[in-house]
Amino acid sequence: MVEGKMTHTLSRIILTLMALLFVSQLPFFSTHAQETTPNNPIMTDEHPDLLIILSPQYEKDTVIRTAINSYITAVYNDLGWTSRIIPIHEDENTYQQIDNIIETTYNNHSVKACIMVGEDLNTALGGDCDYLEQPSTLPWSTLGGTTTYELTQQGIICKPTTLNICISLLYPTHDLSYEQKKSSIISAFHKFAIQRHTTNQNIIRVFESSDLNTNSKAMYQKLSNHGDISYTEDATDSDISTSLTESYTAYFVHGHSTPAGTDVNAQKNIGWFTAETLDTLQTPFFGADGCYAGGWWSNQQDNNKLDSSIDGCWYGSKIFTSTHIRVMALGLLSQNGFSTPVSFLENVVPELLTGKTLAEAMIGDTCIGDFIIVGDPTFHFTI
């Protein structure tokens, strides 16, 4: 009887040890482990090439996360880039704290690009005038904290600056319903995920006002080194309409601008390129070259503050409604005025047209910083 009891007890001990060993091999799930703090971001990889910053409004939305994860997979399959999602809590939602999170991550591994998702992310002011608002991404695209940019009461000062990270905004209009904004974000990431292979058709369309092109005309025409350029000075509404029947590698408009459009004719009411046109434009890359082209409308006049966008026509919002456009560059793309090239048009576009991703074409370039990127920073042409 004693021997039988000992055998039975020994068997139970062995079974218990085997059970513990089995459990130890299972993945450990913890709701708290998925909480979003800058010290414990959700990891896709320890050394990310791409960061996706989720605003407080969307950080817990599982459907948005699913769309982002599909995009992350597509980017990895296309470029081999690894990614990390970093959600932002309300109590850390200042552009300075977000900058610190980005730079801390960069110090561990050189990040190439960062997509800022959510219009409620606190963003630096680039300028405001009447009801026009212009964000600045310079604090996030540079390294060294406040030592790399100059801040005044009126916003971030634009000056020649070396870009270390490509920052792209994905900001729906503030005053739309949550479901509308959520749907917009999901559809954008879906577009970015499935449109990975874009052939360079070597056709570049440029509409430019003669009122502003003393120096930029030669810059735009120099793009002919990278493809056939169709350049029109002082275009008419008819010219704009005709252009919509064709597809292009890249499409640029340059002139006096607002968030709603660009005057591509020196005479008023002759050639107005409206942002609404982007819904039918057939190009993966669009550039609007002009003041406040990278901004939005608000219901607040000048107050030295970046106010919320209102539902209206503005370039950046069209990334969510355009079928073809993957990424936009909006702002002063051809401004120079320095002894060395510091414009987006001179430094970034030629490299983009040779097959580099937009992010890689921007990294290390010196730019004035008076433009923003909207859309997919991993966009590239298949050469």
Residue ranges and their predicted role:
Residues 1-34:
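Secretory targeting signatures
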Residues 34-383:
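Cysteine-dependent hydrolase recognition
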